[in-house]
Amino acid sequence: HLRTRRQRQMCIRDRALRDVEKEIERMESWATTPKPNVPADNLALDASVKDPATFIRTMYNLIYLAFKTDSTRYATYMLQSMNSSKWDNVPIALGLGATHHLLAHNAVKGGVHLERLGKYDKFQADLLAEFIAKLADTPEGEGSMLDSTVVLYGSSNSQTHVNTDYPLMLAGGEKLGLKPGRLIDFGQVAPPLSNIYLTLLNALDVPSQQFSDSN
């Protein structure tokens, strides 16, 4: 039994060493891969929050180029942060007269307050639409880059800081078995957000039975 246990431990050790060797080989291969040549014409790398449209558009263009050159296959971008004095003031830079935090809280009053928040939401949505259109217009295989890319656009908590009824948008992924182009209203059912993440894991060939509190 002792001999069997030692053999098992040696097998585990050898497997772990081989995994480390493979990872080192992968990293060395990536490190020596020539960097792609990409046009920088549409990249305003000196953009700042003082010109939010140019800054956000540049960030989306960087993500697009990273995908196009296969420099990465995963990207996250936090478009807004109310905890950042710079980004919370973006609506003021756009002439909307208040910080994003105040716009969100005052929207419940309706009238001009709701209209201002709507304009800011549209500002962000228009830039997202440009990014999605660029993916859709880029041929890839037998379809477009959007067909094999998942774009998940989220939101913040509600006016009362409640983290339910999040509006979310999922675009692309038709080649991955997803079915975009639908409006789904869950009403009072309130399924956990992790259900979406579980669906995406499986669509992206990461077989999973559970993710967080998914049901």
Where are these regions (language model features)?
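Single conserved hydrophobic/aromatic residue that forms the stacking wall/gate
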Residues: 1-12
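Extended, H/D-rich, highly charged conserved domains that either
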Residues: 13-89, 100
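Feature marks hydrolase-like catalytic cores characterized by long aromatic- and Gly/Pro-rich stretches
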Residues: 68-71, 79-215
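Short acidic-aromatic active-site loops that bind/stabilize oxyanions
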Residues: 1, 49-56, 114-125
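Charged, low-complexity, helix-prone segments enriched in Lys/Glu/Asp/Gln
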Residues: 8, 20-28, 32, 114-124
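Broad gene-expression machinery/nucleic-acid interaction feature
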Residues: 7, 74, 165
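Generic alpha-helix detector with strongest preference for long hydrophobic helices that associate
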Residues: 1, 44, 58, 109-112
